[in-house]
């Protein structure tokens, strides 16, 4: 892999612990399928960007790992502990492994739940970000981090979790100002999912939502959705 190629890293929790804030709208098995569908759309968009050479998915979940490999991704096993600290440690370890194998490649840590992500958004991020140093794209709320890009050969040093944008900026990351609605729209709630659909969710997420009958407005009761 050539220096300054970008290697993307995507962390995914165990499926039985994912998307708990959608529990009032979706049964556990539907939430698990949604996580996989959104990951598929996120990976498909990411691997379509010419400047991104490879994707590694960091996960303790076998089903997630199988999907990642089927889409051409690499897998770094994350310890099963479910916390922001364990996720950040696993991302950092995966990033160090990438650098050990491929030298001074650029690193891009992405959220896994970006079903409306478009390749041109990521391409614009890579074109807009400073050639050296660190940069982030905040999420739609302005407090989380949708993407963390490291181009200075330094450690990834991820700080995902509550208020991660502030922590990444305090550590020297530039807050990129582009619009990029699909990149900024991670999905934690029913309202987030509806907005992602409005923006144009990818084919895997659309197919899953049709299959499980996600057709009601956000404020309507769960019994009419599932």
From Swiss-Prot:
It is an enzyme of class 2 (transferase). GO terms for molecular function: GTP binding; phospholactate guanylyltransferase activity. Its EC number is 2.7.7.105. Pathway: Cofactor biosynthesis; coenzyme F420 biosynthesis. It holds the Pfam family CofC. Guanylyltransferase that catalyzes the activation of phosphoenolpyruvate (PEP) as enolpyruvoyl-2-diphospho-5'-guanosine, via the condensation of PEP with GTP. It is involved in the biosynthesis of coenzyme F420, a hydride carrier cofactor. Signal peptide: none annotated. This is Phosphoenolpyruvate guanylyltransferase. The keyword Transmembrane helix does not apply. It catalyses: phosphoenolpyruvate + GTP + H(+) = enolpyruvoyl-2-diphospho-5'-guanosine + diphosphate. Keywords: GTP-binding, Nucleotide-binding, Nucleotidyltransferase, Transferase. GO terms for biological process: F420-0 metabolic process. HAMAP family: CofC. Belongs to the CofC family. It comes from the Bacteria. Phosphoenolpyruvate binds at residues 145, 161, 164. It comes from Nocardia farcinica (strain IFM 10152).
């Amino acid at each position: 892999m050539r220096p300054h190629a970008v290697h993307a890293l995507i962390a995914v929790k165990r499926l039985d612990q994912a998307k708990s804030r959608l529990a009032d709208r979706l049964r556990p098995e539907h939430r698990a399928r949604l996580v996989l569908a959104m990951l598929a759309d996120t990976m498909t968009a990411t691997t379509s960007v010419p400047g991104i050479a490879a994707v590694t998915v960091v996960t303790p979940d076998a089903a997630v790992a199988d999907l990642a490999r089927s889409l051409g991704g690499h897998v770094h096993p994350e310890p099963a502990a479910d916390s922001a600290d364990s996720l950040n440690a696993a991302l950092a370890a995966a990033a160090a492994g990438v650098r050990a194998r491929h030298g001074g490649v650029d690193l891009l840590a992405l959220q896994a739940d970006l079903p409306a992500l478009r390749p041109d958004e990521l391409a614009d991020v890579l074109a807009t970000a400073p050639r050296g140093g660190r940069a982030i794209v905040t999420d739609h709320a302005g407090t989380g981090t949708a993407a963390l890009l490291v181009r200075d050969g330094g450690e990834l040093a991820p700080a995902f979790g509550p208020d991660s944008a502030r922590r990444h900026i305090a550590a020297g990351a530039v807050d990129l100002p582009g619009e990029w609605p699909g990149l900024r729209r991670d999905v934690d709630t029913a309202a987030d999912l509806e907005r992602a659909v409005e923006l144009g969710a990818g084919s895997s997420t659309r197919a899953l939502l049709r299959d499980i009958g996600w057709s009601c407005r956000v404020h309507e009761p769960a019994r009419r959705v599932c």
